Amino acid sequence: MLSEVLLVSAPGKVILHGEHAVVHGKVALAVSLNLRTFLRLQPHSNGKVDLSLPNIGIKRAWDVARLQSLDTSFLEQGDVTTPTSEQVEKLKEVAGLPDDCAVTERLAVLAFLYLYLSICRKQRALPSLDIVVWSELPPGAGLGSSAAYSVCLAAALLTVCEEIPNPLKDGDCVNRWTKEDLELINKWAFQGERMIHGNPSGVDNAVSTWGGALRYHQGKISSLKRSPALQILLTNTKVPRNTRALVAGVRNRLLKFPEIVAPLLTSIDAISLECERVLGEMGEAPAPEQYLVLEELIDMNQHHLNALGVGHASLDQLCQVTRARGLHSKLTGAGGGGCGITLLKPGLEQPEVEATKQALTSCGFDCLETSIGAPGVSIHSATSLDSRVQQALDGL
């Protein structure tokens, strides 16, 4: 087992095109969001395994000897396995969480224990570890925060247990694992996501593992070969939404008006495919006119999503504010509030960007400038992380 400190990060995700249509067998494009979750793992010898999640105020510790003495045969040794309902109940006993524990805390702890016990039980003795996870991603905003958490845990635990090698060499600031190792990280992260979401699609953990852009179609996930990093504004309207109700609303509208809604879904599919083609071209040789196409696709998709009934007054306001400044926006994810993205073309002056952010903030929204198409799960040297991240991991 490794004895050094590991620093791992993984990105969030946004849906670029295809939300809601994907439920009806159409293509969706998901891209990594360069708001990241950071994990620090420190092996120690105090006989405890500590988990600290400062974003949601969690600090938990378990006695390694007690975990070691448990009958963990309910966790099948060998390949990556899917957690069963019996395993979940057993893990709840192991976790020792109070009955009034918040759902977010319970799920985060169960995912951690499942991955820790499943990955580390092949060791002669369960390792004594101190793990801190801090995220730039707001939870529950549809930005893949739970997947980034699961990916960071899987990567760090597999590395510390030497199931996969540490790719960080002397002198490296940051590095990534091989394709084969990333596949194993992704498989375990998917099981962590299952602990949290029950029946996830696998898109969020795949985007967080691989980075860049992915295409999702009828259960099949594939990476776009070359996708450019694009600058965006990510705006959180802070309007809560009920994803299940929004998905049901689209289904009901499709049943009520099949000849109207089915062509809308087909058209959204065509938007996703055209965007995929343009991103491929941009990866080889970016040109200004390609940004114009991306902007048109954003506008068309936003109108289609409004026609499906998943818009919201807050999202209309976001689009109006940015359109007044010559920028193009759409909702991302379930709609009905939540988040929206605004494409920032190269050459846009920083004062213009700041003025747009200010205008959106004055609407009561949270607005961040970031990029999409960021690298997937990565391992960092201590000196390469900025002081803000270091302080957050130190609990300062």
Swiss-Prot record:
The active site is at S146, D204. InterPro entries: GHMP_kinase_C_dom, GHMP_kinase_C_sf, GHMP_kinase_N_dom, GHMP_knse_ATP-bd_CS, Mev_gal_kin, Ribosomal_Su5_D2-typ_SF, Ribsml_uS5_D2-typ_fold_subgr. Farnesyl pyrophosphate and geranyl pyrophosphate inhibit mevalonate kinase activity by binding competitively at the ATP-binding sites. One of its GO terms (molecular function) is mevalonate kinase activity. The gene is MVK. Homodimer. GO terms for biological process: cholesterol biosynthetic process; isopentenyl diphosphate biosynthetic process, mevalonate pathway; isoprenoid biosynthetic process; negative regulation of inflammatory response. Keywords: ATP-binding, Cataract, Cholesterol biosynthesis, Cholesterol metabolism, Cytoplasm, Disease variant, Kinase, Lipid biosynthesis, Lipid metabolism, Magnesium, Metal-binding, Nucleotide-binding, Peroxisome, Steroid biosynthesis, Steroid metabolism, Sterol biosynthesis, Sterol metabolism, Transferase. Changing E19D: No change in protein stability. Weak decrease in kinase activity. Approximately 2-fold decrease in Vmax. Approximately 2-fold decrease affinity for ATP and mevalonate. The lineage of its organism: Eukaryota, Metazoa, Chordata, Craniata, Vertebrata. Pfam families: GHMP_kinases_C (PF08544), GHMP_kinases_N (PF00288). Changing H20P: In HIDS and MEVA. It is an enzyme of class 2 (transferase). It catalyses: (R)-mevalonate + ATP = (R)-5-phosphomevalonate + ADP + H(+). Mg(2+) binds at S146, E193. The keyword Manganese does not apply. This is Mevalonate kinase. Changing S145A: Modest changes in KM for ATP. 20-fold increase in KM for mevalonate. Approximately 2-fold decrease in Vmax.
